[in-house]
Amino acid sequence: MAVKFSILVVCLNPGAKLAETVESIRKQEYRDYEIIVKDGGSKDGSTELLPADEKIRLIEKKDTGIYDAMNQAVSEAAGEYVLFLNCGDLFYDEQVLTRTAKAMEKNPGKGIYYGDTYCSKTDSLQTAPGRMTPFQCFRNIPCHQSCFYARRLFADRQYLPEYRIRADYEHFLWCVLKQKEEAVSLPFTVAA
């Protein structure tokens, strides 16, 4: 079944953070989404605490690291757009998907829609640039948990798992600079 959004949550022994992340998704007022929890073999019982919900799919499969896990999750996605909201990440409020869907209706078919990210540890807002220029790409790209990617951008090329960190940054650069995909700023905070 096709849905508008696939919210992808990757984890390995996340403890209570898994339930917190999933609950923040389930609180969204906009309902045209699926949740894919990609677990790499947790032994802490966290996946057993997932609520019974037809919108949640649990994929339990070994992976070689965070980006391999994210690639496995996106391979299972049915949504037109995907967002990686990994364990510990939360939607900023219950209107994020509603506001995002409305923004997409006003400016349809773009490769990436991105917003701001609130960091609770530092009580600060990571403000994404209003317009994504090549200069901004190397200076201030948005956090992955605040980027809605067209799923098609992962069809031919996923995250490069040889990167232990920043493969999400590299993939954003590939999409915008190499593939010339338009990245549209959302005028609100997406994730916390």
Where would I find each of the regions flagged by the language model?
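Nucleotide-sugar donor-binding/catalytic module of glycosyltransferases
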Residues: 1-192
